[in-house]
Amino acid sequence: EDDYARLGTKAQMNPPLRTKADQAALWAGIKDGTIDTIGTDHAPHTLVEKAKPYGEAPSGVPGIETLLPLLLTAVSEKKINLEDVVRITKTNAEAIFRLPSNEDIVLVDLKKTKLVRDEDMKTKCGWSPFAGQTLTGWPTHTICQEKIYKCS
């Protein structure tokens, strides 16, 4: 509810943002296994597109760059644990969608804190609904098909 006041039409998404009680229920659902998997549709609409009036602004927000740090922050806050993160982002997704298990790995620094800033976003839209928040737990490297990529 507070996010609508802060973000305006940038917060327009489907399904819409919910109450704090709904958010708490989602965390509980991850913890107790009710929620099988989680993802982001990553709708990187530009600020020009999102500046349109409600109903004309496209729905959706960018999320791929902050999904893992948001989940790792929830781990640091004891809302969920690391096993929950692996289960909802990898293990269950592979099983549900019959994806091949691969040897790709994401290395994370669970203690790294970083302020989310619009100017640091790599996607075309150049903004994040989480700008201004400090998140704890960030990827440092990805190993994909035997190639190592350093995260910035």
Ranges and model annotations:
Residues 2, 21-31, 72-79, 138-148:
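Low-complexity, flexible helical/coil segments
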Residues 11-21, 58-62, 129-134:
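A short acidic, glycine-rich active-site loop
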